[in-house]
A protein has these predicted regions:
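Beta-rich, blade/repeat-based domains predominating
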Residues: 67-90, 125-139, 148, 184-203, ...
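Secretory targeting and sorting signals
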Residues: 1-29
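Residue position within the beta-strands of beta-propeller blades
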Residues: 37, 99, 142, 206, ...
Length: 402
């Protein structure tokens, strides 16, 4: 029987072999940026790096083990994706990358080194079932669902443990240190899906699908959460999932609605709130995108446009956004496979990358995934300009881009 170390080595070799199939190696010196995805594999999680050229095309880079395990499923449904927004995140200066290991209840920090990564540390997230993280100016927070941990991946059903969040300080070199007093309980069975820190580190926000609300926690001088204010989900919507914060405190949520078997689907919405005045937690605006299970949001650098991917519709919606939080849906583009999940955009906001998963609906088998490449037009519309081979694992969860 192979040792754990041998199994991990074999797994990494297999991922590298499949990830490079059908892709040109590309000139290393031509990289203008990168796309990072997490395999979320139960046998050993890893981050796959793609190099981006000036035309937005992606070329396979390396595969870097996290030192932890992914999950064969997630706490909500017996499918091999994280069911969250934020499994992989970059520091604002893009010099550090953080990847969550659901199956090990840990998070790993990497230094970004040219076209590769250097692993720095892997630490406990202080809870069970970590699924989302965000990093800002030396502070990182991570949510824990309280769901099945090691030994019970993909067991299905709602989490039975205590949902929490926990904060860390990270050094310029990537070392993670827990923030004393930061571990905070979230409502039971709240199913946290995303967490975001505001750039000034005065507050953070967490979407809680199971509780049908988003909570805004003020942070004290030591970056410890204080008493939160709850933003109930917009009337006519349900289950806030993805989360984005703008530079002028507009908070956006992607409300997944009631997808099958809970409801008929087609009722997802994008909703905005004023996060600067939590004493009046009512929506600024809400616009239906007529999709099912809208669960991920990415904004352009100037915050004038945004994109929301819908898992069960297999679509990416474009929308415009004003400084006052007014939302207007522009249109939608299909992904090349069945399910649309995590997204990332290039730092110049010229290209959008979307994880597109090939699913066998009869067997509920997530067979493989690829990255679809879209050009972001000046009017916020998208144009599909390429795709990688269907070479990534079907469990791939989390994406960050530079």
């Amino acid at each position: 029987m192979l040792s754990r170390k041998a199994r991990r080595a074999a797994f990494t070799t297999a991922v590298l072999a499949t990830a490079t199939a059908g892709l040109s190696a590309g000139p290393a010196h031509a990289a203008r940026g990168h796309v990072y995805v997490s395999t979320n594999a139960e046998a050993g999680n890893a981050v796959v790096v793609f190099n981006r050229d000036a035309k937005g095309r992606l070329y396979q880079g390396g595969v870097f083990e996290t030192g932890g395990n992914g999950a064969g499923g997630n706490p909500t449904f017996p499918v091999p994706i994280s069911d969250s927004d934020g499994m992989v995140t970059l520091s604002p200066n893009r010099k550090l990358l953080f990847a969550i290991n659901i199956g090990s209840n840990t998070i790993t920090s990497f230094q970004v080194r040219g076209n590769g990564l250097r692993r720095i540390s892997t630490v406990s997230t202080g809870g069970i079932g970590p699924n989302a993280a965000d990093a800002r100016n030396g502070v990182l927070y991570v949510t824990n669902t309280g769901g099945p941990g090691p030994g019970a991946p993909g067991s299905g059903g709602p989490p039975t443990g205590q949902p929490t969040m926990m904060g860390f300080r990270y050094s310029s070199g990537g070392t993670l240190t827990p923030i004393s007093g930061s571990q905070t309980n979230l409502p039971p069975v709240s199913l946290p899906a995303a967490i975001r820190l505001d750039p000034q580190l005065t507050y953070l926000a967490v979407t809680e699908r199971g509780a049908n609300q988003t909570q805004r926690f003020p942070l004290d001088a030591g970056h410890v959460p204080d008493t939160p204010v709850a933003y109930p989900v917009n009337a006519g919507s349900a289950h806030p999932f993805a989360l984005a914060l703008t530079s002028n405190d507009v908070m956006l949520t992607a409300d997944e609605g009631n997808p099958p078997p809970e409801g008929p689907g087609g009722d997802s919405r994008i909703t905005s709130y004023n996060a600067a005045t939590p004493q009046t937690p009512t929506p600024l605006d809400s616009d239906a995108n007529s999709q099912t299970a809208t669960c991920w949001i990415v904004l352009t650098g100037n915050e004038r446009y945004g994109f929301a991917s819908s898992a069960l519709s297999g679509m990416v919606t474009s929308f415009s956004l004003t400084a006052q939080g007014q939302i207007t849906v522009i249109g939608a583009q299909p992904v090349t496979d069945t399910v649309a999940t995590d997204m990332g955009r290039s730092r110049d906001s010229k290209f959008l990358y979307v994880n597109s998963i090939n699913v066998d609906p009869m067997a509920l088998a997530f067979k493989s995934s690829r990255i679809d490449i879209y050009r972001i037009n000046s009017d916020g519309t998208l144009a599909l300009i390429g795709k990688t081979a269907s070479s990534l694992l079907g469990s791939t969860s989390g994406m960050a881009a530079s």
